[in-house]
Amino acid sequence: MTLFHFGNCFALAYFPYFITYKCSGLSEYNAFWRCVQAGATYLCVQLCKMLFLATFFPTWEGAVGAYDFIGEFMKATVDLADLLGLHLVMSRNAGKGEYKIMVAAMGWATAELVMSRCLPLWVGARGIEFDWKYIQMSIDSNISLVHYMAVAALVWMWTRYDLPTHYRLPVTVLLGLSMYKAFLMDCFVHIFIMGSWTALLLKAVITGVLSLSCLTLFVSLVHGN
């Protein structure tokens, strides 16, 4: 039973990535090693972020249950490094914009999935007692994949030299929202004392709105040119 539960969680977390890779056409371009390089860039960026946070933002020692809004906001600002990392990955790949976006997003999201969820699923989902948090973790990995696709598309649009002026503001706003999404989520959860399923639903809704807005801008920009 425990192995069956682990298999379900593993399939829910990893199969959408495999299906996306196969159905997006990346496999036809032999983009596997490009995605691996994007994943390696993710690891380097996260290491730099960890060193920076450990140096300039030590653990906050406030009251129990209190939330350091200013400190967490400053920490969320460090996620700007993720945008720079995605831009670096896309700038090193030749090809159409769609290809660059998919390679960067797949490599980035897969590296995060392996590094942050593989071990917890292997250790926890095989436990004797069933726990919904591993199902939630698997669903959250799918939300992260959609999130990074949207972020990669926004970075690609923002760095285009021929981006029309009237696109600059909405793209910048969406980039800011994507960068501070985790911080805003933590604020909502802390203020409204949300449960885990409610927080996951809110994250899915915010990611969906962000992704649909990004898709609208991307389609209008590509077709407009």
From Swiss-Prot:
Residue ranges annotated as Cytoplasmic topological domain: 22-34, 91-100, 158-166, 219-225
Keyword entries, A-Z: Cell membrane, Endoplasmic reticulum, Membrane, Transmembrane, Transmembrane helix
Positions on the Lumenal side per record topology: 59-68, 127-131, 190-196
A GO molecular-function descriptor: ribosome binding
Reported function: Component of the multi-pass translocon (MPT) complex that mediates insertion of multi-pass membrane proteins into the lipid bilayer of membranes. The MPT complex takes over after the SEC61 complex: following membrane insertion of the first few transmembrane segments of proteins by the SEC61 complex, the MPT complex occludes the lateral gate of the SEC61 complex to promote insertion of subsequent transmembrane regions.
Family statement drawn from the similarity comment of this UniProt entry: Belongs to the TMEM147 family.
Protein name: BOS complex subunit TMEM147
Lineage: Eukaryota, Metazoa, Chordata, Craniata, Vertebrata
